[in-house]
A protein has these predicted regions:
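Charge-dense, helix-prone N-terminal extensions
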Residues: 20, 47-48, 58-61, 110, ...
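Hydrophobic pocket/interface hotspot
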Residues: 22, 32, 57, 75, ...
């Protein structure tokens, strides 16, 4: 019998850039490639990008240590410069390990932007995330922030 472990986390960042600029880092394929392309040593196998409600984004490849990951996302709700809601499935070495929903909220604050990312994950069939999803998402959001400079 399969098992499910539920988990959630929230990440908050403040940047000096306007919400429109931060939103474009998600909405524009070239801008997103600067921060969402895998860690150093990542060998990309597949990538697609269709940023619209109902659109799909995928990224798969092999990490430096040999692990193969696949991200398969569907955008559920997009309010330009304010909100992005998406759900996604992650595979690790060909095995489905999780199904998640995430919401990114962008709010003007002190002449810049407050980003709040909240994610709810269902970790499947004995996969022990041990905080790696939150760690990886923090790394991605930090990389996004650097790409804005």
């Amino acid at each position: 019998m399969g098992s499910v472990v539920h988990a959630s986390f929230t990440i908050t960042r403040h940047w000096k850039h306007a919400p429109q600029r931060v939103f474009q880092a998600f909405a524009d394929e070239a801008a997103k490639r600067k921060w969402f392309a895998g860690p150093p040593g990542f060998e990309q196998h597949e990538k697609s990008f269709d940023f619209r409600e109902g659109g799909r984004e995928t990224l798969s490849g092999k990490h430096a240590g040999g692990m193969v990951t696949a991200f398969d996302c569907v955008y559920r709700d997009i309010v330009p410069n304010e909100r992005i809601v998406y759900s996604y499935v992650m595979h690790l070495d060909g095995k489905k390990i999780s199904v998640s929903q995430a919401c990114i909220e962008l709010t003007p604050e002190n002449g810049g932007t407050k980003l709040v990312l909240t994610e709810y994950g269902d970790y499947l069939d004995g996969y022990d995330d041990a905080g790696s999803r939150e760690h990886g998402t923090n790394w991605l959001i930090d990389t996004l922030g650097k790409s804005l400079e």
